[in-house]
UniProtKB/Swiss-Prot annotation:
Native organism: Pongo abelii
Lineage: Eukaryota, Metazoa, Chordata, Craniata, Vertebrata
UniProt-annotated location(s): Nucleus; Cytoplasm, Cytoskeleton, Spindle; Cytoplasm, Cytoskeleton, Spindle pole
Subunit structure as annotated in this protein's UniProt entry: Interacts with AURKA. Interacts with importin-alpha; leading to inactivate TPX2. Interacts with HNRNPU; this interaction recruits HNRNPU to spindle microtubules (MTs). Interacts with BCL2L10. Interacts with KIF11.
Gene this protein is translated from: TPX2
KW Nuclease (keyword) present: no
Keywords: Acetylation, Apoptosis, Cell cycle, Cell division, Cytoplasm, Cytoskeleton, Isopeptide bond, Microtubule, Mitosis, Nucleus, Phosphoprotein, Ubl conjugation
Protein name as it appears in the record: Targeting protein for Xklp2
Glycyl lysine isopeptide (Lys-Gly) (interchain with G-Cter in SUMO2), cross-linked positions: K476, K640, K732
A single MF term (Gene Ontology): importin-alpha family protein binding
GO cellular component, one term: cytoplasm
Comp. bias regions, Pro residues: 418-428
UniProt family annotation: Belongs to the TPX2 family.
Keyword Membrane: no
Residue positions where Phosphothreonine is found in the record: T59, T72, T147, T337, T368, T498
Length: 739
């Protein structure tokens, strides 16, 4: 951790060096004599006081030999830092500054108080308080060590040059301060040795960023005011005209400007945290700055227009530019090589250098202006009237009029009537060919065939009836039953169902579908239109009903009579009543009745019923029952005769006549338009010829050279300079005077 080092005062002996004598050229050899004597004296004093061992083996002018102040730690709570600093100041005030024993006292104090680590606060407010406290300590110590010192004896800072010239105001103020101090404390001046004070460069007041910004803004305002004045003068000269002589501005005497260090503008670091000063050889660093640039010969002044304030509203010429579609822009961007890949030509570099040839020469030859009107807007897509008329002409030329042949009846003069249509014969009625009549005829022919005479023909008797029994089925040989022991001992014996319990399954009667009657037309049953009532989908009503039923059931159970306890009578133990013993009958052998035999008989029976039903339906379908004939009683169909009026002759207009009139009007209009165009072209040609003649006359007038008179200017008055000659002073290369 870095330790906080307070500023210290230097106890110098009574015999001090006069720095004004160092400016003499003859004393340059013994410049370092005073510093060597000073270092030897300090080593002697420290050796006597017992601290000489600390400084052995070190050069006398090292910074390590300098005295270190007492370290006080920083604490965030309470103002302990300020209290410790005040105690330190009191201790320093009690000890005289010129006493050599002060080193011993401070060494003893530093031994007693152990070095504590510094606690650095990162807050800006704490840093500002620290800076103010340090400034206050520096001022207090500067007052204590203030002695009657001549200003010429103050050591120069590292950045300032040693110069004999000083402002009279500063000298006067310095003399006043020294005289006042000498008058107020004559006794102190006698007792104390004269000590060189701190140089003024170290007592700089640090400015805040706000003050620096204000200074910058003030400077900028002053520059703007000066520029305005110059512009006004230049404007007056320009308005006065070219013929008047231009007044040259008289060069003023150089004004002395105070030093302005750029380091003051930077944000300063804490003085305790700055890096140690590195010693640099002054002679090696000399003449490293760049050489002064050669003066460039200025050419003639080129008159430039005033950059006055103008409106920011864009005009039509500025806004409108060549229209390039977005697709074309994208394609150009991908095809274009970036500028950074293009090689620069040497001509561009040559043009950058200032030269007399770069001044533009005003040409006297007339030149046509390079107008950019064709690039202002996008190309016009709509066609002009001239183009439209040309297209119409082409269409008219392409269209060929073809006249129809003349009808000779028009010239005859008689009325042209339409041809009469041919007379159609009257409708002949045709009788209806009904299907019923055909069926009646077919039925009569069938009846005649049925009435034919029946003759009996005997058939031969089958021999099988005589040989064997026919129609009785053979008796099936049943298998012998195998006896099995009855399973009485089994607990989980499955009892076979008795025949009484078994319900006889009725055989499923398969009904054949009726044969459709193809004579009757099919009429589908139209479903009845029912309006569906929209009900809300909810379970609330159902839940409520269920809850009501539940409550009703609970009430009924509650209303029911409470069962009364009735004790059973005691049994009679005298007689033992046992159930009668049931004697089971012996199993009798019965023939087996298989389900397969029963199923086959049922199937044969159902098949027989189906055949009978089909035959009956076929017979019913064969019998046709005709509907009564109502056509005979109705009136026959008679077509109605149309009652058309006689055709009346109407006036008519031929399309050829109409087209001929329109054609004549069009030709007349076309001839008028052509005549107007020819007249306009003739007028335009005449105007153009007149303009050319006027332009030639104007150019001839302008080309006649008129020489300007020779201008007369005031003679130059050469004035001798009032400034004194520069006195050469040898430079002070030694860095020892820089504190």
């Amino acid at each position: 951790m870095s330790q906080v080092k307070s500023s210290y005062s230097y106890d110098a002996p009574s015999d001090f060096i006069n720095f004004s004598s160092l400016d003499d050229e003859g004393d340059t050899q013994n410049i370092d004599s005073w510093f060597e004597e000073k270092a030897n004296l300090e080593n002697k004093l420290l050796g006597k006081s017992g601290t000489g061992g600390l400084f052995q083996g070190k050069t006398p002018l090292r910074k390590a030999n300098l005295q270190q102040a007492i370290v006080t730690p920083l604490k965030p709570v309470d103002n302990t830092y300020y209290k410790e600093a005040e105690k330190e100041n009191l201790v320093e005030q009690s000890i005289p500054s010129n006493a050599c024993s002060s080193l011993e006292v401070e060494a003893a104090i530093s031994r007693k108080t152990p070095a504590q680590p510094q606690r650095r606060s990162l807050r800006l407010s704490a840093q500002k308080d620290l800076k103010q406290k340090e400034k206050h300590n520096v001022k207090m110590k500067a007052k204590r060590c203030a002695t009657p010192v001549i200003i010429d004896e103050i050591l120069p800072s590292k950045k300032m040059k040693v110069s004999n010239k000083k402002k009279p105001e500063e000298e006067g103020s310095a003399h006043r301060d020294t005289s006042e101090k000498n008058a107020s404390s004559p006794e102190k001046a006698k007792g104390r040795h004269t000590v060189p004070c701190m140089p003024p460069a170290k007592q700089k007041v640090l400015k805040s960023t706000e003050e620096q910004e204000l200074e910058k803004s003030m400077k900028m305002q002053q520059e703007v005011v000066e520029m305005r004045k110059k512009n006004e003068e230049f404007k007056k000269l320009a308005l006065a005209g070219i013929g008047q002589p231009v007044k040259k501005s008289v060069s003023q005497v150089t004004k002395s400007i105070d030093f302005h260090f750029r380091t003051d503008e930077r944000i300063k670091q804490h003085p305790k945290n700055q890096e140690e000063y590195k010693e640099v050889n002054f002679t090696s660093e000399l003449r490293k700055h760049p050489s002064s640039p050669a003066r460039v010969t200025k050419g003639c002044t080129v008159v430039k227009p005033f950059n006055l304030s103008q409106g920011k509203k864009r005009t039509f010429d500025e806004t409108v530019s060549t229209y390039v579609p977005l697709a074309q822009q994208v394609e150009d961007f991908h095809k274009r090589t970036p500028n950074r890949y293009h090689l620069r030509s040497k001509k561009d570099d040559i043009n950058l250098l200032p030269s007399k040839s770069s001044v533009t020469k005003i040409g006297r030859d007339p030149q046509t202006p390079v107008l950019q009107t064709k690039y202002r807007a996008r190309p016009v897509t709509c066609k002009s009237t001239a183009e439209l008329e040309a297209e119409e002409l082409e269409k008219l030329q392409q269209y060929k009029f073809k006249a129809r042949e003349l009808d000779p009846r028009i010239l005859e003069g008689g009325p042209i009537l339409p041809k009469k249509p041919p007379v159609k014969p009257p409708t002949e009625p045709i009788g209806f060919d009904l299907e019923i009549e055909k069926r009646i005829q077919e039925r009569e022919s069938k009846k005649k065939s049925e009435d034919e005479h029946f003759e009996f023909h005997s058939r031969p008797c089958p021999t099988k009836i005589l040989e064997d029994v026919v129609g009785v089925p053979e008796k099936k040989v049943l298998p012998i039953t195998v006896p099995k022991s009855p399973a009485f001992a089994l607990k989980n014996r499955i009892r076979m169902p008795t025949e009484e319990d078994e319900e006889e399954d009725e055989p499923v009667v398969i009904k054949a579908q009726p044969v459709p009657h193809y004579g009757v037309p099919f009429k589908p049953q139209i479903p009845e239109a029912r309006t569906v009532e929209i009900c809300p989908f909810s379970f609330d009503s159902r839940d409520k009903e269920r809850q009501l039923q539940k409550e009703k059931k609970i009430k009924e159970l509650q209303k029911g009579e409470v069962p009364k306890f009735k004790a059973l009578p005691l049994p009679h133990f005298d007689t033992i009543n046992l159930p009668e013993k049931k004697v089971k009958n012996v199993t009798q052998i019965e023939p087996f009745c298989l389900e397969t035999d029963r199923g086959g008989a049922l199937k044969a029976q159902t098949w027989k019923h189906q055949l009978e039903e089909e035959l009956r339906q076929q017979k019913e379908a064969a019998c046709f029952k005709a509907r009564p004939n109502t056509v005979i009683s109705q009136e026959p169909f008679v077509p109605k005769k149309e009652k058309k009026s006689v055709a009346v002759q109407e006036p008519f207009q031929l399309a050829t006549e109409k087209r001929a009139k329109e054609r004549q009007e069009l030709e007349k209009r076309m001839a008028e338009v052509e005549a107007q165009k020819a007249q306009q072209l003739e007028e335009a040609r005449q105007q153009e010829e007149e303009q050319k003649k006027e332009e030639l006359a104007r150019l001839r007038r302008e080309l006649v050279h008129k020489a300007n008179p020779i201008r007369k200017y005031q003679g130059l008055e050469i004035k001798s300079s009032d400034q004194p000659l520069t006195v050469p002073v040898s430079p002070k290369f030694s860095t020892r005077f820089h504190c």
